[in-house]
């Protein structure tokens, strides 16, 4: 490999790094200035990160709600939960392109809150098995 090729490769890598840094800044701005909560689910370990805004939507602090699906499932309306689990399963199986469900939750203070949950599998293994799914929670007024 010549020195010119190394210089061109270095310039390309620097541009890619600059673009990634810019995209990260945009994403951080959006997440900071939106009222939506978000979640990130590692399907292999069943760890589901629940953002502080998502927990706040439901009336909880960061420490009051564990990062696992059971945390939100336990306060979701049972019929909505059944419908939602079916939609998640359909999406994980590749039947649907993405996942959407409207759910009623019992807020920590006791009132009902309606939330639109949207998500998508963003990582699959070599056998097309889902590994990671991410999504958002939007309060419906």
Predicted regions and their residues:
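Short N-terminal helix-initiation segments at or just after the protein's N-terminus
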Residues: 13-20, 45-51, 76-83
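PAS-family sensory modules
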Residues: 1-38, 132-141
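Intrinsic disorder/low-complexity signal
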Residues: 16, 35, 39, 76-79, ...
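PAS-family sensory domains
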Residues: 4, 8-11, 61-133
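Hydrophobic pocket-lining residues within nucleotide cofactor-binding pockets
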Residues: 43, 122, 140
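A sequence-level detector of short linear motifs
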Residues: 49-50, 114, 132, 139
